[in-house]
């Protein structure tokens, strides 16, 4: 749907106006309760990982119904981005089911797998934690040496030149550039200069993500980038800036989303529906090519 990027972004400023509290209490929560009942979604604690195709279909239908009614709330403009069923179907129809990533000896197929598919999964390895500057390069090298690795989402930096990284601060820029250059250097040192990256996790802000886009020393066109949904079913201008830049620079965009069990989604039933709806949000709002899910419980 990248070819309709600006049409979708326009809705972040022209959609229906609504205060955030009303969006949550008058639209999102009531609609979630409605679709749980309508589609008879019921969690069985004795069977936490069901193999019920009918249940899976109903969760999907509930998520579509929920997303089309609720949309996505922009916290900066207080506007609700809404989409039609026809637009959603078009986006799903047009979405490729696989992409070629990396290059040369490290080119791989990053693609869809069916339920019970015997095809080998695409493996992105990541420690997903911060490292001290002195160990960062070595940590990247250690992961890149893994033979099963198809792509890397590298460690994060918590400090730069001994200073804590602060979002939207020059120190964040310095740390993110250091992260990007060290990751590229690590890939060269192990003989995998063209391996697929999902980067740069150290860059929290939109301006830092834009700053590390560089074919020579930073994140390249064709690499993966991440943009988060805001819990629940929300976004803001900074997230939209990231999503827009990723498409313009030629990167694969991944949507990060984590429905909170016991929060606005409710219990297991609502969490499953909400997490499925985030796939639709990623596709329509961020024009994302892949999804990373992390539903969680705060207790």
Regions found by a protein language model. Name each.
Residues 1-213, 228-237:
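Metallocofactor- and cofactor-centric catalytic cores in central/energy metabolism, strongly enriched
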Residues 202-203, 212-299:
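Glycine-rich anion/phosphate-binding loop at the beta-strand->alpha-helix junction
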């Amino acid at each position: 749907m990248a070819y309709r990027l600006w049409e979708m972004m326009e809705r972040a400023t022209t959609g229906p106006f609504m205060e955030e509290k009303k969006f949550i209490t008058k639209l999102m929560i009531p609609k979630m309760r409605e679709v749980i009942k309508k589609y008879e979604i019921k969690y069985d604690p004795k069977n936490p990982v069901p193999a019920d195709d009918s249940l899976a279909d109903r969760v999907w239908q509930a998520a579509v119904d929920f997303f089309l009614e609720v949309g996505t709330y922009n916290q900066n403009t207080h506007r609700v981005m809404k989409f039609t069923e026809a637009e959603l179907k078009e986006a799903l129809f047009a979405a490729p089911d696989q992409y070629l990533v990396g290059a040369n000896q490290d080119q791989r197929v990053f693609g869809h797998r069916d339920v019970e598919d015997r095809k080998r999964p695409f493996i992105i390895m990541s420690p997903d934690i911060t490292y001290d500057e002195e160990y960062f390069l070595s940590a990247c090298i250690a992961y890149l040496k893994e033979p099963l690795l198809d792509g890397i989402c590298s460690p994060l930096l918590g400090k730069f030149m001994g200073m804590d990284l602060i979002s939207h601060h020059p120190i964040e820029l310095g740390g993110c550039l250091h992260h990007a250059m060290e990751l590229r250097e690590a890939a060269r040192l192990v003989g995998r200069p063209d391996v697929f990256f999902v980067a740069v996790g150290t860059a929290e802000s939109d301006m830092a993500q834009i700053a590390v886009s560089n074919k020579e020393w930073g994140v390249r066109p064709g690499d993966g980038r991440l943009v988060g949904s805001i819990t629940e079913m929300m976004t803001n201008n900074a997230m939209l800036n990231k999503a827009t830049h990723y498409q313009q620079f030629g990167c694969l965009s991944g949507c990060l989303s984590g429905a909170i069990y016991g929060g606005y989604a409710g219990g297991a039933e609502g969490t499953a529906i909400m997490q499925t709806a985030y796939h639709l949000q990623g596709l329509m709002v961020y024009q994302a090519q892949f999804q990373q899910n992390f539903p969680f419980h705060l207790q």
